[in-house]
């Protein structure tokens, strides 16, 4: 990385941005073939970035920025198994988890693929046995309900994928996900469960995660109370590496599945953490999911920057975050089953790049991760789209939509697609004051009424968006979409010069919670040393306990 060259390119981009006068609509008028020139079609996903406020000059400067930052070299290091997670001295080789050909992948000189393939086969064998009923509940019946207990990457990924791929889930299985230490999460789930035919998957690499183990212990108590202590071994399995703790919990050793330190939590759905996904959709469909991720790995690793979708996605983010100072990005899938996708991306993007320190330990020189948020269309249109169209903050948007439905009524889907395309069009084009006045006059309003109402009905337009279009949402397509965002995040981290694979920001709160827990449990514990606000709040909590 050449930081001087990076700074120089950022300065050139700033000058270019200040000189930019054209609206997005202007760019379409200048170039009638803009869509053809500003979209990339992969095997199953079309990425349309024509509705962005960028020209060829903009993109050339952004590609120069990527090269100055060393994106190509760092990409090679990533795939070569270098310790790109510098604060924890680890590689980030989640790509190996979705590699299907078994070709060597090295981590510190060791080929990890034999272990990856062996663990994958172990997961597949167990999952298929659960699906077919050859592994049974304690009463000899087939399992009907699967509960994944985890938090963070051990919940967000599996929950999102299973929800998104609902049409592919086995009819005889009902999937549940529990993450929050709030007892209502597990309690409400337990009320719905036929415990006699329920399998619990406990996902915690260390088998010490506070939220996960609290929920797991409560679930264990429920099983032991209703079905007997001996049933615990039949109704629990684990994704962890701590065999001694798992044995003490009562889980059989052949029902334990592991993964490696080079798999970050937010990249772990491809690993044994995805066991609930494999049980839900089956090994064959899960391989299609892995194939989708592998498709994008190959594209990202080999495509020139100028035609590399994750690179362009990242550069657009940099352009808006650092040159236009847009602080948020919305992700709007026009697919109800994708309603957890934006939450999944929140962790992937904000935990990875929500950093203020460079690799060297010096403060960053540019703004880093935006706030990522969103809801499915068309629901969002009746909630926050008012702000997107007419608010004072400009929010770049990612739209995701399938050309064909997955088992839904065609009439419904046609309306869904029309709304998706209409929103991106309206955000780009807007509606001028002159056009509004013409429309109101045509509706019969007098001049005074027109002049009063017209300003309220103006749409500024020039609001940027990307559209991801695919035939229908399948395991392979979902794998492609996830991997596109994973590699986007990596490229951004290289340019911002941060470690995208650690998450020290989650530690302080956990540390303080551990100190406060005994104080909250013991009403006589001293509040000495606490700040005034925290002490005051605990005092009020103690009053409520007495009441």
Curated annotation (Swiss-Prot):
Look up keyword Metal-binding and say if it applies.
no
Q: In which pathway does it act?
A: Carbohydrate biosynthesis; gluconeogenesis; Carbohydrate degradation; glycolysis; D-glyceraldehyde 3-phosphate and glycerone phosphate from D-glucose: step 2/4
Q: Where does the record say this protein resides?
A: Cytoplasm
Q: Which InterPro entries match?
A: G6P_Isomerase, G6P_Isomerase_C, Phosphoglucose_isomerase_CS, SIS_dom_sf, SIS_PGI_1, SIS_PGI_2
Q: Listed GO cellular component terms? A: cytosol
Q: What does the record give as EC number?
A: 5.3.1.9
| GO annotation (BP), single | gluconeogenesis
Its EC top class is isomerase
Keywords, alphabetical: Cytoplasm, Gluconeogenesis, Glycolysis, Isomerase
Q: Does the keyword Cytoplasm apply?
A: yes
Catalytic activity annotated for this protein?
alpha-D-glucose 6-phosphate = beta-D-fructose 6-phosphate
Example GO molecular function = glucose-6-phosphate isomerase activity
Q: Pfam families recorded for this chain? A: PGI (PF00342)
> Its biological function?
Catalyzes the reversible isomerization of glucose-6-phosphate to fructose-6-phosphate.
Q: Which NCBIfam families match?
A: PRK00179.1
Put simply, this protein is called Glucose-6-phosphate isomerase
Please report the organism this UniProt entry assigns to the protein.
Answer: Beijerinckia indica subsp. indica (strain ATCC 9039 / DSM 1715 / NCIMB 8712)
Point out the gene that encodes the protein.
pgi
């Amino acid at each position: 990385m050449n930081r001087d060259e990076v700074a120089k390119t950022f300065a050139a981009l700033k000058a270019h941005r200040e000189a930019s006068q054209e609206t997005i609509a202007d760019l379409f008028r200048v170039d009638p073939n803009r869509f053809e020139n500003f979209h990339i079609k992969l095997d199953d996903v079309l990425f349309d970035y024509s509705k962005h406020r960028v020209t060829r000059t903009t993109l050339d400067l952004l590609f120069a920025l990527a090269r100055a930052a060393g994106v190509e070299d760092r990409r090679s290091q990533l795939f070569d198994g270098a310790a790109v997670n510098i604060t924890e001295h680890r590689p980030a080789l989640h790509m190996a988890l979705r590699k299907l050909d078994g070709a060597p992948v090295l981590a510190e000189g060791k080929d990890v693929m034999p272990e990856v393939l062996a663990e994958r086969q172990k997961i597949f064998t167990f999952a298929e046995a659960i699906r077919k009923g050859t592994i049974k509940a304690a009463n000899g019946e087939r399992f009907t309900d699967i509960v994944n207990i985890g938090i963070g990457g051990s919940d967000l990924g599996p929950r999102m994928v299973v929800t998104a791929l609902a049409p592919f889930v086995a009819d005889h299985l009902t999937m549940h996900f529990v993450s929050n230490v709030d007892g209502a999460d597990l309690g409400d789930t337990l009320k719905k469960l036929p415990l006699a035919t329920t399998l619990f998957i406990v996902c915690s690499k260390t088998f010490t995660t506070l939220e996960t183990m609290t929920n797991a212990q409560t679930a264990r108590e429920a099983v032991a109370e209703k079905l007997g202590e001996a049933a615990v071994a039949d109704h629990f399995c684990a994704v962890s590496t701590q065999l001694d703790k798992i044995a003490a919990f009562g889980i059989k050793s052949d029902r334990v599945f592991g993964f490696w330190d080079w798999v970050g939590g937010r990249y772990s759905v491809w690993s044994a953490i995805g066991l609930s996904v494999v049980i839900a959709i089956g090994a064959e469909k899960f391989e299609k999911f892995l194939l989708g991720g592998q498709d994008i790995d190959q594209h990202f690793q080999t495509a020139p920057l100028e035609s590399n979708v994750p690179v362009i996605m990242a550069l657009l983010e940099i352009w808006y975050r650092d040159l236009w100072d847009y602080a948020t990005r919305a992700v709007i899938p026009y697919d109800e089953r994708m309603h957890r996708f934006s939450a999944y991306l929140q962790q992937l993007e904000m935990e990875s790049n929500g950093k203020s320190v460079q690799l060297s330990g010096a403060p960053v020189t540019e703004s880093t991760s935006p706030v990522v948020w969103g809801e499915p269309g068309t629901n969002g249109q009746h909630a926050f789209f008012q702000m997107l169209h007419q608010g004072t903050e400009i929010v770049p948007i990612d739209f995701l939509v399938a050309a064909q439905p997955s088992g839904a009524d065609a009439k419904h889907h046609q309306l869904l697609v029309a709304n998706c395309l209409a929103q991106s069009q309206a955000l780009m084009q807007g509606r001028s004051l002159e056009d509004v006045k013409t429309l109101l006059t045509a509706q019969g309003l007098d001049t005074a009424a027109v002049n009063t109402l017209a300003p309220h009905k103006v749409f500024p337009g020039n609001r940027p968006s990307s559209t991801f279009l695919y035939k229908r949402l399948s395991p392979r397509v979902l794998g492609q979409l996830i991997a596109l965002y994973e590699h986007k995040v990596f490229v951004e981290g290289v340019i911002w010069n941060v470690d995208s694979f650690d998450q020290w920001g989650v530690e302080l709160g956990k540390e303080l919670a551990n100190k406060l827990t005994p104080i909250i449990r013991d009403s006589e514990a001293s509040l000495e040393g606490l700040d005034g606000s925290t002490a005051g709040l605990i005092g009020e909590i103690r009053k409520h306990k007495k009441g």
